[in-house]
């Protein structure tokens, strides 16, 4: 399938974009383990994430996404703050951001992914 299915979420809002993998690094050294030392954008959580929901065909969206932190009442950002490694929380060192949010903040995510051509005409389910 040549069309890109784009997804993003700002809590639950969706949009589209792209990111580059070269600049990701953990944010600080908090809670570093031997496992954490091996995490990269290319190998983050490759296993099926929810054993109770196993599907024969699935695609992980883990990896680098763009992110932005804005006031909670702000519009969709035109420019994003940087890269975040999904599935890690923005507060986590492994996210590459390591930033605390307040109740007055909104966190926006943006990425692009390709739907496999074998899935053409099938129903898709996105889990966040």
Whereabouts are the PLM-identified features?
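Positively charged n-region of N-terminal signal peptides that target proteins for export
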Residues: 1-4
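Sec/Tat signal peptide C-region and signal peptidase I cleavage site
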Residues: 17-21
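Bacterial N-terminal signal peptides
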Residues: 7-16
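Low-complexity, intrinsically disordered short segments enriched for Gly/Pro and polybasic residues
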Residues: 6-8, 98-99
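Extended carbohydrate-recognition surfaces in non-catalytic/accessory domains of CAZymes
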Residues: 22-127
């Amino acid at each position: 399938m040549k069309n890109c299915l784009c997804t993003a979420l700002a809590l639950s809002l969706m949009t589209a974009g792209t990111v580059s993998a070269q600049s990701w690094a953990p944010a600080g050294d908090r809670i570093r383990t031997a496992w954490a030392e091996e995490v990269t954008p290319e190998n983050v959580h490759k296993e099926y994430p929810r054993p109770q929901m196993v599907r024969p065909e699935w695609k992980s969206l883990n990896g680098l996404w763009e992110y932005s932190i804005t006031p909670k009442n702000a519009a969709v950002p035109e420019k994003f703050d940087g890269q975040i490694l999904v599935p890690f929380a923005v507060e986590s060192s492994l996210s590459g951001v390591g930033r605390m949010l307040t109740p007055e903040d909104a966190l926006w995510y943006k990425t692009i992914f390709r739907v496999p051509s074998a899935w053409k005409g099938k129903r898709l389910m996105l889990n966040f």
